[in-house]
C-alpha cells in the first residue's frame, strides 16, 4: 500500500462502541469523491483519484463498505485487491478516520480473505510501513507474517523514503 500511515484517530470510547453491521459492494466511479475524502484525511501520502480510477479500469477488485443500516450511502471503508493468479495482493485497506478502532478494519479484512479464498486464491500478500503499528497489529492478529522487506519503498516526510514490510498469509477455509 502506498500511503504513509497515521495511527488511527481513535477517540477514547471508540473501541467500546459497537461495530456497525457492514454491507459491501463493488466500488464505482461515482464513489470516488467519498473515497478521496477519506483517503486524503487518513494518509499524509494518499493515493490519487487517478490511482483509484486506474484500479477500476484495470479490473482490480475494488470494494466499498458501508453501514447496513442508518447511514445511507456514507462509506466507512474501502479496499483494492489485485489478483496474481492464485494469490491476491491487498493494495489498499482503509477505514474512515472517525470510525477507527471499532473492529471495521478487521471485519473488512476477514471478508476480503474469505471472498478471495472462495474465488480460488490461496494466499494474500500486502506491503505495510513498519511505522504503521495499528496496521501491523491488525495483520499479525489476522495471521499474517512478515516475509520480506522492500527497501525505500514509500515516500516519507522531507523527501525521505521508508521501507515496506511484505506480509503474507496463506488462505484457508477457516
Ligand atoms: C489500519 C486500519 C485499516 C485498521 O482499521 P480499524 O477499523 O481501525 O481497526 P480495528 O478496529 O478493526 O482493529 C483491528 C486490530 O488492529 C489493531 N489496532 C487497531 N487500531 C490500533 C491502534 N491504534 N494501535 C495499535 N493497534 C491497533 C488491533 O490489533 C486491533 O485488533 P484487537 O483490538 O482486536 O486486538 C485503519 O486504522 C486505517 O484505515 N488506517 C489508516 C490507513 C492505513 O494505515 N491502512 C493500512 C495500510 S497498510
Question: Residue ranges of each PLM-predicted region?
Answer:
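Conserved catalytic-core motifs of GNAT/GCN5-like acyltransferases
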Residues: 2-3, 125-127, 140, 145-165
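Short, contiguous pre-domain boundary segments
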Residues: 15-21
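Short acidic/glycine-enriched loop/turn segments that link adjacent beta-strands
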Residues: 59, 86, 132, 154-161
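Conserved glycine-rich acetyl-CoA-binding loop
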Residues: 96-110, 117-119, 123, 129-137, ...
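Acetyl-CoA-dependent GNAT
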Residues: 2-8, 17, 26-100, 106-119, ...
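Flexible coil/turn residues that form the inter-helical turn or adjacent wing/linker of helix-turn-helix
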Residues: 45, 122, 160
Amino acid at each position: 500500500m502506498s500511503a504513509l500511515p497515521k495511527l488511527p484517530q481513535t477517540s477514547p470510547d471508540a473501541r467500546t462502541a459497537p461495530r456497525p453491521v457492514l454491507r459491501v459492494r463493488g466500488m464505482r466511479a461515482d464513489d470516488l469523491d467519498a473515497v478521496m475524502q477519506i483517503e486524503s484525511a487518513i494518509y499524509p501520502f494518499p493515493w490519487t483519484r487517478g490511482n483509484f480510477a486506474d484500479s477500476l479500469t484495470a479490473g482490480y477488485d475494488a470494494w466499498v463498505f458501508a453501514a447496513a443500516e442508518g447511514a445511507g450511502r456514507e462509506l466507512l471503508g474501502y479496499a483494492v485487491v489485485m489478483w496474481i493468479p492464485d494469490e491476491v495482493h491487498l493494495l489498499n485497506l482503509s477505514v474512515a478516520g472517525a470510525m477507527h478502532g471499532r473492529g471495521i478494519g478487521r471485519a473488512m479484512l476477514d471478508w476480503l480473505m474469505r471472498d478471495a479464498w472462495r474465488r480460488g486464491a490461496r494466499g494474500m500478500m500486502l506491503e505495510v510501513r513498519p511505522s504503521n503499528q495499528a496496521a501491523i497489529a491488525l495483520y499479525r492478529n489476522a495471521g499474517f507474517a512478515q516475509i520480506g522487506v522492500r527497501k525505500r519503498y514509500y515516500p516519507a516526510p522531507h523527501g525521505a523514503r521508508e521501507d515496506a514490510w511484505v506480509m503474507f498469509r496463506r488462505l484457508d477455509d477457516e
